[in-house]
Swiss-Prot record:
It holds the Pfam family DUF711. InterPro entries: UPF0210. It comes from Methanocorpusculum labreanum (strain ATCC 43576 / DSM 4855 / Z). Belongs to the UPF0210 family. CDD domains: RNR_PFL_like_DUF711. Coiled coil: none annotated. This is UPF0210 protein Mlab_1030. NCBIfam families: PRK05313.1. SUPFAM superfamilies: PFL-like glycyl radical enzymes.
Length: 454
């Protein structure tokens, strides 16, 4: 039985501790839109998205009003466009027309982001997939709401190093194409290893081919709630610490489950998953870094940071799986630098380096996220960082990703402003030694021995 204390506790979480539903993401399959005629394909894509998603934003606002739960974003993910446009597109420019159509549809239904301008190339690349990848810089430069992702490896297939090399070049080209906006295009481009089919979070969301025609996935956010709960157990042993995180994660996820089921029922679209991720914002008090510091670190980046993050990630999952029948997506703690005030402060005080962030990604849900680096960083160095991150994901059988922003015209120590939820970031140094000869070998890194389970 729910008592009045629990009701007040939830209200306090929302009003004072920044508890919110970060996103309701509607996944839409576009496989039935495929056509050999590009104009027909674009028409079908626009018509399907605007038909299926027409009530998404209104329903989200309705649930917000009725339950008093803030729902920050309403978003859409679609089938990877390299699969949808393969028959009709014969050049990168053809794919850009689809990006413009998706952008128009997103604007029409009122969502702030649409993900799925994507290619899955973990083992090899078709011509269509290569064309889509080559179109990414132009597509992100001429659209407002489109997010792009490329899966370049997996535990079962290994790492496609040809794709890794190409993505190093594409990240740099995207930075150049959007340099008048502080290279903002790179904030909407993610390179994955082991990308999940049901991720509700941008910029890596796409509607996987294993999914149905449409599905509702929800991502929750509650770093402020977890930090506040830990303040009450300061100095207690690890058992108490873990129990506190776990119970708090349960409450946060329960709210996400409620919103997901309500949205599903009102839209007449099946519920997919709740993503258990703790997603920070640039607001003070809504930070994953501050949780780690509340555990006892002087600053994020200090010795013990990776252990603290591993503990947090595991307890969030243990609490979350009790609260929802279906969990998925990325599910863990996000550590984006520009979107987390505590991370920004740690970088500015010299406590948190790119290498330490890489170590942290081995125990949390995503990877090197929203990190600004000098605009003159070589493409092969970016590719090397992508390869390192993919190797962590491949060997550990987990999702890892890279969202680096080489800011054209900026150098180490400069600050770059992205605005809104994307925040701002200090430009961090990158190792100056070259990996070009390694990246230029080409081919594939084979799957690890423990992937051979048949």
């Amino acid at each position: 039985m729910i008592n009045i204390f629990e009701v007040n506790e939830t209200n306090k979480m929302i009003e004072q501790e920044m508890l919110d539903v970060r996103t309701i993401t509607l996944g839409i399959s576009l496989l039935d839109c495929c056509d050999t005629d590009l104009d027909k394909l674009n028409t079908r894509i626009y018509e399907k998205i605007t038909r299926v998603a027409k009530n998404l934003v209104a329903v989200g606002k309705e649930i917000e009003r009725e339950y008093g739960i803030p729902i920050v974003n309403k978003r859409i993910s679609v089938t990877p466009i390299a699969l949808v446009g393969g028959q009709a597109c014969s050049s990168p420019e053809d794919f850009v027309t689809i990006a413009k159509t998706l952008d128009r549809a997103a604007k029409e239904v009122g969502v702030n982001f649409l993900g799925g301008y994507s290619a899955l190339v973990s083992k090899g690349m078709t011509k269509a997939e290569r064309d889509l990848i080559l179109s990414i810089p132009q597509a992100l430069a001429c659209t407002e709401r489109i997010c792009s992702s490329v899966n370049i490896g997996s535990t079962r297939t290994g790492i496609n190093m040809d794709a890794v090399k190409l993505m190093g070049e594409i990240v740099l080209s995207t930075a150049e194409a959007t340099k008048d906006q502080n290279s903002l295009g790179c904030a909407k481009l993610v390179v994955f290893c082991n990308a999940p089919d049901d991720n509700p979070f941008m910029a890596g969301a796409f509607h996987g081919v294993t999914e149905g025609d449409a599905v509702i996935n929800v991502g929750v956010s509650g770093p402020g709630v977890v930090k506040h709960a830990l303040e009450a157990v300061r100095g207690k042993n690890f058992e108490v610490l873990c129990e506190t995180v776990k119970k708090t994660a349960f409450k946060v996820t329960r709210m996400g489950q409620l919103v997901a089921l309500e949205a599903s029922e009102r839209l007449g679209i099946p519920f997919g998953i709740v993503d258990l991720s703790l997603a920070p914002t640039p607001s003070v008090g809504d930070s994953v870094a501050e949780i780690l510091e509340e555990m006892g670190l002087e600053s994020v980046g200090a010795p013990g940071t990776t252990a603290a993050l591993a503990l947090l990630n595991d307890q969030v999952k243990k609490g979350g799986v009790m609260a929802s029948s279906f969990v998925g997506g990325l599910s863990g703690a996000f550590i984006p630098v520009s979107e987390d005030q505590g991370m920004i402060d740690a970088v500015n005080r010299g406590a948190l380096t790119l290498e330490k962030l890489e170590a942290m990604t081995s125990v949390c849900s995503v990877g090197l996220d929203m990190i600004a680096i000098p605009g003159n960083t070589p493409a092969t160095t970016i590719a090397g960082i992508i390869a390192d991150e993919a190797a962590i994901g491949m060997i550990n059988q987990k999702t890892t990703a890279v969202r680096l922003i080489p800011v054209i015209g900026k150098d180490i120590g400069d600050t770059v402003e992205f605005g809104g939820l994307l925040g701002y970031a200090p430009v961090q140094p990158v190792n100056k030694f070259s990996c070009a000869n390694f990246i230029n070998r080409g081919g594939r890194i084979p799957a690890p021995i423990h992937s051979f389970k048949n």
